[in-house]
């Protein structure tokens, strides 16, 4: 059986872990908000690039008689028109933002699961503390609660 000091120490450790998890959860939620904003921005960039390409405002310094060869984010865009290149670049940016968003959501879920486990541990510790208090009352009063009730009723 755990001593009172051990139970208090475990309760203190649990409180520290809950605080750390709350901080991690807050950071993960901020990262999720940032990832969502990046995804939204990437979507706006995609729309703007498609609009610009449709209006032939994007040329990427391509000479009219030559092929356009452009490497961007380790992707080689060969024999693509300016509009197709802009569309592909925007799609890649959007995919990156989606991947960051999914990672941030997974981080939030993982931290919430850890928080739930620590909260459960805290509940177990509180139950142990309550049992210890009951045992302490029983030790101080060997007759138990019935004895206390009989004494109160006789007054």
Where are these regions (language model features)?
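Charge-rich amphipathic alpha-helical interaction elements
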Residues: 1-155
């Amino acid at each position: 059986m755990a001593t009172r000091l051990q139970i208090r120490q475990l309760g203190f450790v649990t409180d520290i872990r809950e605080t750390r998890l709350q901080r991690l959860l807050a950071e993960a939620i901020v990262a999720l908000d940032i990832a969502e904003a990046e995804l939204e921005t990437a979507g706006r960039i995609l729309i703007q690039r498609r609009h610009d390409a449709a209006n032939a405002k994007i040329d990427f310094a391509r000479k009219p008689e030559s092929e356009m060869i452009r490497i961007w984010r380790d992707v080689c865009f060969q024999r693509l028109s300016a509009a197709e290149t802009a569309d592909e670049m925007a799609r890649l940016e959007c995919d990156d933002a989606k991947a960051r968003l999914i990672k941030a959501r997974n981080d939030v879920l993982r931290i919430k699961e850890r928080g739930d486990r620590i909260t459960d541990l805290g509940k177990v510790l509180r139950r142990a503390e309550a049992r210890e208090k009951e045992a302490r009352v029983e030790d101080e009063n060997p007759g138990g609660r019935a004895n206390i009730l009989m004494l109160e009723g006789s007054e």
